[in-house]
Structure formats: C-alpha cells, structure tokens
C-alpha cells in the first residue's frame, strides 16, 4: 500500500471496520468460503483441539474439518495480548519466542492448515532472529535456506515499522501486529490497526526499538536497516513532513 494510506492514521484515533478479509478490507483469497464449500456445517458447533507442529510449537485447530484444495492462503493473523503467551481466538499458535498469534481468518481452521501457517510463520521468525557464529544477525534461516524477506514482503515490514515508529505508539508490534497471506504468496505485514494509544505516548527519551518483538532483531540485519533508510528517504519522509507542524508536533 502507498505511504499515504499509512499516514492517514497518524493524527487521529481511528474508528473503522475491524480487519477482515474482503474486497473492502484485506483483499485476499477467502478461505472461509473455500472451507464452506467442502464442509456443509462450517461455522456451526465447531470443536477445537490442540496439536504440535514440526517445530514442537502448540497450535489450536478446528477438529473434523475437510481441508480445501489449497491451504496456502488466505490467512489474516493478529498478535494476541502480550501479557499471556496464548492465542485468544478459536484458532492460533504460539511461536518459539512466545508470540501468540490469532488466526482471525479463517475463523475456523483445519489441522493441516493450522500446521501449515504456524510452521510458515515460525520459519519466518527463525530467519529474523538468526545469528552467525559471531553473533551477527543475518536474516537467514539455515534450516530452510531462505532469508526473512523470502517469507514476508520486505516493503510491508519497512512501512509498518516506520509508521509505528513515527506514531510512537506504545502498542506498536507488542499488541498492534497483524499479517496477511494470500494463496501461493508471501506473508505481508499489516494492515495497521488497534492504535488507540497513538500518537506520541512514547516519550522522546524512551527506547522504542530495544527489546521490541521482531523490531529489535530486524534492525540488526544490515539489509533491513538499509531498506528502512532508502524507503524513508525516497518515500516516507516527504509524507511525514506534511503532517508535522510548528515545534515538531504531528498536526491534527
């Protein structure tokens, strides 16, 4: 999405529809429709159960569902409350670093599909946090042979980071973290939402980047830092400056 779209939320508390899959929301493959096509009672009297993926991480799925032909998308994920390493939607998973992700769509997700998306996301997280023997962050998952940007679109990661960094939102990434993935495609960061504390509730002297999930590791990857700098210089900075008034305050 263009930078202008992200900028619109900087100066206001957003009142809008909840993130959802659809032509006016996240326009990706509707897996709920695909599930309903092969499960006559989809959405009624669903029962969930727990299992472990190949990384040994727990996920919750909907029992008894017939899977659609393509389980690679679309998914809409949102981070759960960081105070508890447990998803609070019907289906979701917990990563190796204690990040609980809700699967917002499809609302009811079969076992194979949940294994797929939880393992895909874990491979991405492992790539972000990967280090070489000297402790340098590489962004490379040696087990899968892929870089983090081969799992998640790099530009979307940069956009979400810059927006939340500029907004100085305490919820950024900690709670306000969403991803979506279409069938056969990469994961994308966003849409940005749940910024009810924005803007500026983190003071100038506070450390926004240090210790924050994903961000603290991404910023130690040289390629990500370069991508942030390039996008900020070429696109983001001009849009941000339009919002800044006298004294450096974001205009309302």
Which residues does each predicted region cover?
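Phosphate/dinucleotide-binding and metal-coordinating scaffold of catalytic cores
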Residues: 1-252
């Amino acid at each position: 999405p263009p930078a202008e779209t992200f900028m619109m939320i900087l100066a206001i508390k957003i009142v809008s529809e909840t993130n959802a899959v659809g032509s006016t929301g996240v326009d990706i493959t509707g897996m709920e429709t695909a599930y309903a096509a092969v499960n006559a009672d989809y959405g009624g009297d669903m029962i969930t159960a727990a299992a472990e993926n190949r990384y040994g991480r727990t996920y919750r799925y909907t029992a008894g569902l017939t899977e659609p032909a393509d389980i690679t998308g679309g998914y809409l994920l949102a981070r759960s409350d960081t105070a508890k390493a447990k998803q609070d939607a019907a289906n979701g998973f917990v990563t190796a670093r204690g990040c609980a992700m809700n699967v917002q769509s499809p609302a009811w997700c079969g076992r194979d599909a949940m294994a797929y998306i939880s393992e895909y996301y874990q491979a991405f997280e492992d790539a972000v946090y990967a280090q070489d023997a000297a402790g340098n962050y590489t962004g490379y998952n040696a087990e899968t042979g892929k870089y983090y940007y081969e799992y998640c679109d790099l530009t979307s990661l940069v956009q979400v980071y810059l927006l939340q960094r500029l907004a100085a939102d305490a919820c950024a990434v900690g709670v306000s973290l969403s991803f979506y993935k279409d069938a056969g495609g990469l994961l994308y960061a966003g849409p940005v939402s749940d910024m009810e504390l924005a803007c500026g509730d983190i003071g100038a002297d506070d450390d926004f980047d240090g210790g924050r999930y994903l961000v603290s590791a991404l910023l130690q990857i040289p390629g990500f830092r370069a991508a942030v700098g390039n996008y900020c210089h070429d696109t983001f900075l001009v849009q941000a400056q339009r919002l800044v008034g006298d004294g450096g305050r974001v205009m309302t």
